[in-house]
């Protein structure tokens, strides 16, 4: 399946197996033509070191990593280890998406569209414009209530 995906311009494969299947994931990674990214495997800073050699990169989500400071430390460590970086999200308001977007310049990929799934988002913040995350030019992280 990964071979098939690689022939169709897929960028990477995210968490192909349950997080407990560490050896099996490392086996897949050794044979994969695509980078293998950690998601459920990863929550906090110590998990980044555990991901080394098992995954090619990590998907950092603020809601799992406890916030900007921890997420930043995770990104710095992963970069030092030569890993790929992605900032991701779950279904979250524009407040959380805008906070996560502060780290986007450090990342190889950004998947920050969780606010688009909310019909009653109470915040105005980062926006997706032509596939690019644009940060507001306001103080702090730039979020305001609507």
Map each language-model feature to its residues.
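General beta-strand structural signal in soluble alpha/beta enzymes
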Residues: 14-15, 38-39, 87, 110-112, ...
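Catalytic cores of alpha/beta
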Residues: 1-5, 23, 43-55, 74, ...
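Active-site-adjacent beta->alpha loops and helix N-cap segments on the catalytic face
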Residues: 17-30, 45-47, 66-77, 96
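Charge-rich, low-complexity amphipathic helices
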Residues: 27-28, 35, 50-51, 73, ...
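P-loop/Walker A phosphate-binding loop and immediately adjacent motor/lid segment at beta-alpha junctions
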Residues: 30, 62-64, 72-90, 131, ...
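Flexible C-terminal active-site loop/helix
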Residues: 90-146
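Glycine-enriched alpha-helix->loop->beta-strand junction motifs that scaffold or abut catalytic
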Residues: 4-11, 29-36, 52-59, 77-84, ...
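Catalytic beta/alpha-barrel core
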Residues: 8-21, 34-44, 56-67
